């Protein structure tokens, strides 16, 4: 797993976990604002543009981040923040190691998956995957996410770079 890092390693650490189809850049502004007071870590979740391996499971992402925290951050952090897929990974981390953080912020994490959704994702996404690489379609998706306009180029570049099987895997997981 790849990591982006901001601030001093001597400060309290905050870990930000991005949502599916997003990446570290989704937290760039927050990291810049907080880096003078906190040590910020933003993993690039598996299967996303810039990652070093395909997406497998929420559990394996959680294990990898826990291992990183054990090895480099003395086993726990001040705060763990997760959005959507990142929120699910954060919840899994907390279930594997309850003392991984002092505080947690979880946003829009699915805790009970829909069986019918999981069945439909693969065939529907296989048909619509070529659209992901189209700029006009990416703009429509981007508007639905309500992200800041200046993040569009990052979003489009990274979404277009995600492999079909990775996209299906993390859509099914979340």
Please provide the spans of the model-predicted regions.
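Conserved alpha/beta-hydrolase catalytic His-Asp/Glu region
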Residues: 115-117, 132-174
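Conserved HGGG/HGGXW glycine-rich cap/lid loop of the alpha/beta-hydrolase fold
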Residues: 5-52
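Nucleotide-sugar donor-binding loop of glycosyltransferases
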Residues: 44, 84, 108-110
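Active-site signature of alpha/beta-hydrolase-fold catalytic machinery across serine-
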Residues: 29, 92-96
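Gly/Ala-rich beta-loop-alpha elbow adjacent to hydrolase catalytic centers
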Residues: 82-86, 90
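Structural signature of beta-strand start/N-cap positions in the alpha/beta core
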Residues: 13, 39, 77-79, 102-103
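Flexible "cap/lid" loop of the alpha/beta hydrolase fold
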Residues: 95-96, 101-131
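Active-site loop/oxyanion-hole signature of alpha/beta-hydrolase fold enzymes
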Residues: 29, 41-81
